[in-house]
Amino acid sequence: MIQMQSMLGVADNSGARSVMCIKVLGGSHRRYAGIGDIIKVSIKEAIPRGKVKKGDVYNAVVVRTRKGVRRPDGSVIRFDNNAAVLLNNNQQPIGTRIFGPVTRELRNEKFMKIVSLAPEVL
């Protein structure tokens, strides 16, 4: 469950290390974002010579949350951290690699590129 001011890790090799959610997209007063939702983020920490720099604003898709996601069979998939993948204006990932596991729910959300790059899909 991600809301404004939430800090997230970055699960790709775009050069960002941590980002802060500045807006949850998809509704005028939408408060929370879960796995597969698009948020607006500001880069808070970045590595030198990366594709992005500190202070930049991007869209990102949430790929892991501590809150997790409930499956139709009643099981819940939870993670140890909150993580997002940065997107460009065409909703494609900026990085060329994805780190850590992602959930099968991203497949329904038109993020097949992220699912195919991920080392593990839960």
Swiss-Prot record:
<dbReference type="InterPro" id="IPR000218">
    <property type="entry name" value="Ribosomal_uL14"/>
</dbReference>
<comment type="similarity">
    <text>Belongs to the universal ribosomal protein uL14 family.</text>
</comment>
<dbReference type="GO" id="GO:0006412">
    <property type="term" value="P:translation"/>
</dbReference>
<keyword id="KW-0689">Ribosomal protein</keyword>
<dbReference type="Pfam" id="PF00238">
    <property type="entry name" value="Ribosomal_L14"/>
</dbReference>
<dbReference type="InterPro" id="IPR019972">
    <property type="entry name" value="Ribosomal_uL14_CS"/>
</dbReference>
<dbReference type="InterPro" id="IPR036853">
    <property type="entry name" value="Ribosomal_uL14_sf"/>
</dbReference>
<dbReference type="GO" id="GO:0003735">
    <property type="term" value="F:structural constituent of ribosome"/>
</dbReference>
<comment type="function">
    <text>Binds to 23S rRNA. Forms part of two intersubunit bridges in the 70S ribosome.</text>
</comment>
<protein>
    <recommendedName>
        <fullName>Large ribosomal subunit protein uL14</fullName>
    </recommendedName>
</protein>
<comment type="subunit">
    <text>Part of the 50S ribosomal subunit. Forms a cluster with proteins L3 and L19. In the 70S ribosome, L14 and L19 interact and together make contacts with the 16S rRNA in bridges B5 and B8.</text>
</comment>
<keyword id="KW-0687">Ribonucleoprotein</keyword>
<keyword id="KW-0699">rRNA-binding</keyword>
<keyword id="KW-0694">RNA-binding</keyword>
<dbReference type="GO" id="GO:0070180">
    <property type="term" value="F:large ribosomal subunit rRNA binding"/>
</dbReference>
<dbReference type="GO" id="GO:0022625">
    <property type="term" value="C:cytosolic large ribosomal subunit"/>
</dbReference>
<dbReference type="InterPro" id="IPR005745">
    <property type="entry name" value="Ribosomal_uL14_bac-type"/>
</dbReference>
